[in-house]
Swiss-Prot record:
Free-text note regarding domains: This protein has four functional calcium-binding sites; potential sites II and VI have lost affinity for calcium.
Residues the record lists as binding Ca(2+) 4: D199, D201, N203, Y205, E210
Positions bearing N-acetylalanine: A2
Start and end residues of each EF-hand domain: 11-46, 53-88, 98-133, 142-177, 186-221
InterPro entries reported in the protein's UniProt record: Calbindin_Ca-bind (IPR051001), EF-hand-dom_pair (IPR011992), EF_Hand_1_Ca_BS (IPR018247), EF_hand_dom (IPR002048)
MF terms (GO), sorted A to Z: calcium ion binding involved in regulation of postsynaptic cytosolic calcium ion concentration; calcium ion binding involved in regulation of presynaptic cytosolic calcium ion concentration; vitamin D binding; zinc ion binding
Keyword Repeat: yes
SMART domains: EFh
Biological process terms in GO annotation: cochlea development; locomotory behavior; long-term memory; metanephric collecting duct development; metanephric connecting tubule development; metanephric distal convoluted tubule development; metanephric part of ureteric bud development; regulation of synaptic plasticity
Keywords: Acetylation, Calcium, Metal-binding, Repeat, Vitamin D
Protein name: Calbindin
């Protein structure tokens, strides 16, 4: 199935989804190591079998990752390599998603009920807005199809809604600073204790200075994952979730809490 799709001159959104599932064997949401090498091998074989030249994007991709064991790509990168239908590809090219800070602001806008999730209707509005910003419109049937596919692509725990970390896979890997925090998330009890410790004036939210102190301590304790030289960037991205400079417990929990007690 994946081979025949890779031979196509134009890949539909549904075919793209099938290709991704085929190669993301461990369901991590990223292609790395053997998964990435399998994709490259099958892509080369499929194009040769179909008598098709590699596109410039494919050639650049093969040159960049073909000889590397440490390569890692997400859905965004693959969407730029394969000849995907235009409107679906636009969802991965939006200016709003070029930086983590803009992504956080977009999240805040569409998580309208502040639940910490974007649910189906919110996701549909999000995608519709992205397409409109690119001066593209799709009918309701196509929009529903894209929404369904996005859920299938990004909803790693299959709960029918997207968490911040799931939605962040719309960002290119190098822009996704949330990946840095995946390995240092705290259980619910630890997170609440930390929040109360750094909310020094006890007003129920953390301001920029209090967040700065928290991040410095996290960097000191987790030097492998976090770089203290990037604190300004971390802070700017996280504060984009705040409400007028006030970072409430539920907002910070999206970044630092694993949710368990």
């Amino acid at each position: 199935m994946a081979e025949s799709h890779l031979q196509s001159s134009l890949i539909t959104a549904s075919q793209f989804f099938e290709i991704w599932l085929h190669f993301d064997a461990d369901g991590s949401g990223y292609l790395e190591g053997k998964e990435l090498q399998n994709l490259i091998q099958e892509l080369l074989q499929a194009r040769k079998k179909a008598g098709l030249e590699l596109s410039p994007e494919m050639k650049s991709f093969v040159d960049q990752y073909g000889q590397r064991d440490d390569g890692k790509i997400g859905i965004v990168e693959l969407a730029h390599v394969l000849p995907t239908e235009e409107n679906f590809l636009l969802l991965f090219r939006c200016q709003q998603l070029k930086s983590c800070e803009e992504f956080m602001k977009t999240w805040r806008k569409y998580d309208t009920d502040h639940s910490g999730f974007i649910e189906t209707e919110e996701l549909k509005n999000f995608l519709k807005d992205l397409l409109e910003k690119a001066n593209k419109t799709v009918d309701d049937t196509k929009l529903a199809e894209y929404t369904d596919l996005m859920l299938k692509l990004f909803d790693s725990n299959n709960d029918g809604k997207l968490e911040l970390t799931e939605m962040a896979r719309l960002l290119p890997v190098q822009e996704n600073f949330l990946l840095k925090f995946q390995g240092i998330k705290m259980c619910g009890k630890e997170f609440n204790k930390a929040f109360e410790l750094y909310d020094q004036d006890g007003n129920g939210y953390i301001d920029e200075n209090e967040l700065d102190a928290l991040l410095k301590d996290l960097c000191e304790k987790n030097k492998q994952e976090l770089d203290i030289n990037n604190i300004t960037t971390y802070k700017k991205n996280i504060m984009a979730l705040s409400d007028g400079g006030k970072l409430y417990r539920t907002d910070l929990a999206l970044i630092l809490s694993a949710g368990d007690n």
